[in-house]
Amino acid sequence: MQIFSYLCTNFRYNAMKNWKILLMAMISLLAAGCAGKGEWRSTKDQDKAPVTKPEITIEGGRLTAEGLWAMGRIGTAVADPETGRIAYTVSYYSVAENRSTTWIRICEPSAISNQPSEDGLRVIDEFVGSDPAWYGNSGVLAYMRGGKVYLRQDGKDKAISINDERIKNGELEGFLMSPDRKKIILVQQVKTVASTADKYPDLPLATGHMHEDLMYKHWDEWTESAPQPFLCDLEVETEGEFVSEARIQNPKNLLEGTKYECPMKPFGGVEQLAWSPDSKQIAYTCRKKTGLDYAISTNSDIYLAKGERLEANGEGSEANDINLTEGNMGYDQNPSYSPNGEWIAWLSMERDGYESDENRLMIRNTTTGEQRWLTKTLDSNVEEYLWMDDTTLLYTAVWEGTIQLYRVTLDGTTQKLTEGQHDLTLADVCDGQAYVLRHSMREANEIYRLPVTGDGLAGASEHSDNLVQLTHENKNIYDQVEMGRVEPRWLKTTDGKRMLTWVIYPPQFDSTKTYPTLLYCEGGPQSPVSQFWSYRWNFMMMAAHDYIIVAPNRRGLPGFGKEWNEEISGDYGGQCMRDLLAAIDQMKKEPYVDETRLGCVGASFGGYSVYWLAGHHDGRFKAFIAHDGIFNLEMQYLETEEKWFANWDMGGAYWEKNNKIAQRTFQNSPHRFVDKWDTPILCIHGEKDYRILANQAMAAFDAAKMRGVPAELLIFPDENHWVLSPQNGILWQRTFFEWLDRWLKAN
């Protein structure tokens, strides 16, 4: 996955490039089932009172770090076709206690009108939990809490009982019920590597990790287990319309005896599995590789399990499952059947090892095997999709700096349904209405509803007028602060092309004054500078500190065609860097930009950009900040865990002396240009970041100090590629602005 994406909403995905579930991954996954992995919780949260919505008074009318952490973070939303109710999740954080709680709210359909109240939806039930999924019977909601699955009805819970030692109740990570509600898939970790204690029982307190192959670490953990799906019989007893008992019987590991992952680490959820409408087939995503083969390949496939494989004592193993995507060498994932079962859809990338290849929406006829690429004319990436009916799908995609909603039929006929200065995440579709999460650089996630049926739908602009806001989660914050203005600018690159650049202005901007200005360097390296809302890289926070922010969609970012997106692999120090400099060079000519007070900031590949520009900026900048950035590309090639990414993006290994692309990449390693460093730099890193190891920041800091360059180092021993805990998040913000103010505002 990509190195970076602080697009805190769903997702997305992915700290390096991904499918935005990650990108929307920062708050929670968008499917009913797996617990979101982007939220931070203390290890003993279940023993404490749940965190509720904080009350906060913000002085001065400007957004603060404390204000950011007081915001409710809306994640999943699911609609019940039987009752019309909506269930959604919202997470609250306690800075004082350094922990969070995720709540589920159930809302009545009567509250969902074209004129919702200022308080948003009328809540009829609220409780602690995550991953809501409608059970499909008289308003029963299935959800997760504390690693267990519950059924909730009329404010009362019924835990699904499990009396089988093969299922670790309390450690479950996801669930997916069959349409007939007679079976359930439970996801749990299965041990795949013998521990030190297994080998030496007399050393139970030894902490060493022993490994004999690659992929021994992934994202922020040592790889000693794999998530695997257990198929179980589900027995539910009722008294009238009410659930009286629920139990699980006959668990069967669909990947028994293997080390394979399903869902795939580190961010996969139950969206990577799908039941057929008749409950007789399971389609699942799996990369059936281990060790070195796993580390160098993105070749996952969609497999089909059916017949005896779905029976408790049935014959056959995963080796008997049908590979529906055999021959496609890139990522294939996230299968979903049409309501009538005639088609199965999934997301697909073509090339092995290229995790940022075009993400295509594919369908396959379940009878004839005919395959179709539905988004062939899109020239961009599909983020997520849902079936609307038997012949129509909805999906979101990035184009020219925003993520919008589209509708496509089985013949590939596509209609753009929305436009505007926002990003949308598709949460659910029910009774001709799409439920989306909408956010922008000026507003965090809120739930909206949009009609999506009918042959005569209006154009995207008119259709966007039908977006109805259903929640107003953070109105109490917005009422106390003034947000800055966000403006799209099309700037000219050094090779004569047009580049979309977002310019963010401080609140109460005065064009007769001059402002310190920041060049924001995006990560990924192929994650778009869309209308994202982040709880660290928050442009409204930067604007609140009276900075202008220049955020270019440089070469290598999606949403501007395939050629633009791919003009970065093997050329880290090339046109993408010239694009960044072109953006700041043009903006500094504006009379309100103080060209003597320019800063440069970025994370992941953006951190690489900062380190590289520190040796090439020719005096433009007065301060740098790099978060989780690459300083030494040769070390990064060996240290990062997902070797496919290093191979593709760097063009090969540094010892391949006749490989011109690889040699060009490594010649542009920032550490080679330290002799030209002369500008103050702040280096930030998390020690649990196994995508880019923390020694990169330590080396950069040491190099600066040994060069006599003012530098500061902020290391988080317990954070990964992101900063997730509340107090660390505020420490990050304070350090960030203290450094910038010191060098860009001090007399």
Per-region residue spans from a language model:
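Conserved beta-propeller blade repeats
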Residues: 71-87, 123-144, 164-184, 216-229, ...
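Short loop/turn segments that connect beta-strands within beta-propeller blades
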Residues: 109-110, 153-156, 234-237, 306-308, ...
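Short glycine/acidic-enriched loop and turn motifs that connect beta-strands
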Residues: 92-96, 148, 191-194, 289-291, ...
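Cap/lid segment of the alpha/beta-hydrolase catalytic domain
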Residues: 290, 465-466, 472-596, 603, ...
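Arg/Gly-rich low-complexity intrinsically disordered repeat tracts
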Residues: 10, 109-116, 307-316, 454
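Active-site-proximal cap/loop segments of hydrolase catalytic domains
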Residues: 538, 543, 551-747
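Predominantly five- to eight-bladed beta-propeller fold
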Residues: 40-52, 101-102, 186-257, 285-288, ...
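C-terminal motif of bacterial Sec signal peptides marking the signal peptidase cleavage site
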Residues: 32-33
